[in-house]
């Protein structure tokens, strides 16, 4: 196997796909030729990043795995934090969670809030708190409101 080049990355499973299983071959081949990382994206109707990153980790041993980018505003921070921690451990520390603004027209179409820089900053803060073992109950900020509720 050639020496991996950490500064060289590829975009895995580009665009729309008929079969997400194609990613398994792409990742194995990228690792074989010495590519340092694979970046994975989401498409609301055909690609879900949590599944793809776990699959990439399962078929590689040295390839870095990153989202470029994930639609963080469509997931609860608890779900995103659990996903990030799980794939980080599953991959032996090779996972990086990339978040970004996405496309307003898609969020408008599904009724999700548009992403702002303030929301992204707040979301990252929530992830850091969760990864430190803290709670987000009672949080009320740009990334969302997570009140503490006992019963209903």
Report the location of each language-model feature:
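N-terminal beta1-alpha1-beta2 module of alpha/beta enzyme domains
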Residues: 1-67
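Internal, glycine-rich beta/alpha segment that forms the wall or movable "lid"
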Residues: 2-3, 79-152
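Active-site-proximal loop/turn and secondary-structure-junction residues that shape catalytic pockets
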Residues: 14-16, 44, 71-73, 101-105
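Short amphipathic alpha-helical segments at helix-loop
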Residues: 37, 68, 108-112
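Ser/Thr-centric signal marking residues that sit
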Residues: 60, 67, 74, 80, ...
């Amino acid at each position: 196997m050639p020496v991996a080049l950490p500064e060289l990355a590829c975009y895995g499973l580009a665009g729309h796909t008929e079969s997400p299983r194609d990613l398994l071959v792409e990742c194995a081949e990228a690792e074989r030729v010495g590519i340092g990382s694979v970046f994975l994206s989401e498409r609301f109707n055909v690609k879900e990043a949590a599944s793809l990153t776990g699959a990439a980790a399962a078929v590689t041993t040295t390839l870095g795995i990153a989202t470029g980018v994930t639609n963080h505003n469509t997931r609860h921070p608890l779900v995103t934090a659990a996903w990030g921690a799980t794939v980080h451990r599953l991959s032996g520390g090779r996972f990086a969670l990339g978040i970004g603004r996405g496309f307003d027209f898609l969020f408008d179409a599904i009724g999700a809030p548009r992403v702002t820089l303030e929301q992204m900053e707040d979301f990252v803060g929530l992830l850091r708190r969760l990864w430190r073992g803290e709670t987000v109950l009672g949080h009320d900020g740009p990334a969302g409101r997570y009140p503490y509720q006992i019963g209903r």
